[in-house]
Amino acid sequence: SLLELGKMILQETGKIAITSYGSYGCNCGWGHRGRPKDA
């Protein structure tokens, strides 16, 4: 589940998944605006 994934990310990286990676990816940022990262 997403909850378990978030717990795993926190345990392995020490980062909170939604705040650290929420704007990462092809649809970056709120409202799917912004430039893609690592593209």
UniProtKB/Swiss-Prot annotation:
This is Basic phospholipase A2 2. GO terms for molecular function: phospholipase A2 activity; toxin activity. Keywords: Calcium, Hemostasis impairing toxin, Hydrolase, Lipid degradation, Lipid metabolism, Platelet aggregation inhibiting toxin, Secreted, Toxin. Expressed by the venom gland. Snake venom phospholipase A2 (PLA2) that inhibits ADP-induced platelet aggregation. PLA2 catalyzes the calcium-dependent hydrolysis of the 2-acyl groups in 3-sn-phosphoglycerides. Its cofactor is Ca(2+). It catalyses: a 1,2-diacyl-sn-glycero-3-phosphocholine + H2O = a 1-acyl-sn-glycero-3-phosphocholine + a fatty acid + H(+). Belongs to the phospholipase A2 family. Group II subfamily. SUPFAM superfamilies: Phospholipase A2, PLA2 (SSF48619). Its EC number is 3.1.1.4. GO terms for biological process: arachidonate secretion; lipid catabolic process; phospholipid metabolic process. Pfam families: Phospholip_A2_1. GO terms for cellular component: extracellular region. Binds 1 Ca(2+) ion. It is found in: Secreted. Inhibited by ethylenediamine tetraacetic acid, ethyleneglycol (beta-aminoethyl) N,N,N',N'-tetraacetic acid, p-bromophenacyl bromide or N-bromosuccinimide, but not by iodoacetic acid or diisopropyl fluorophosphate.
